[in-house]
Design a protein with these regions (language model features):
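Polybasic/polar functional segments that serve as interface/processing modules
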Residues: 1-117
């Protein structure tokens, strides 16, 4: 499952997909079109053409997890449609999943300290 502190990337597949696809077809898309290993633990967010639905695919170490969410009103905020993926931070992913405009969520990056204490 998607857990806090997850180090593996969370990616949006920017091109809409056919939402009749299940976990096997989406995993095949990850492998053939996005050139990623769907069993690596990477989280991939897929969008519908209407923009009000997402499917989230992730391998949790024991099996493929497919989450399907439909907004009752409105649509999700999406990047421009193009080939490929776009990386999301954990905070951006959580905002997207809540139906918020994740593009406004910017984490402050702080370099790690060089020494403890």
């Amino acid at each position: 499952m998607i857990v806090a502190g997850q180090r593996l990337p969370i990616l949006i597949a920017t091109r809409p997909v056919d939402f009749r696809c299940g976990h096997q077809a989406l995993a095949l898309m990850v492998q053939t079109e996005l050139k990623l290993d769907p069993h690596s633990g990477v989280t991939v967010v897929f969008r519908s053409k209407r923009g009000d639905r997402v499917k989230i695919l992730v391998w949790d170490g024991t099996g493929m997890v497919l989450i399907y969410k439909v907004l009752e009103q409105g649509s999700f905020a999406w990047p421009r449609v193009q080939d490929g993926t776009m990386r999301l931070s954990r905070g951006q992913f959580e905002a997207l999943f809540e139906g918020l405009d994740w593009r406004r969520v910017m984490a402050q990056r702080v370099p790690p300290p060089t020494a403890a204490g």
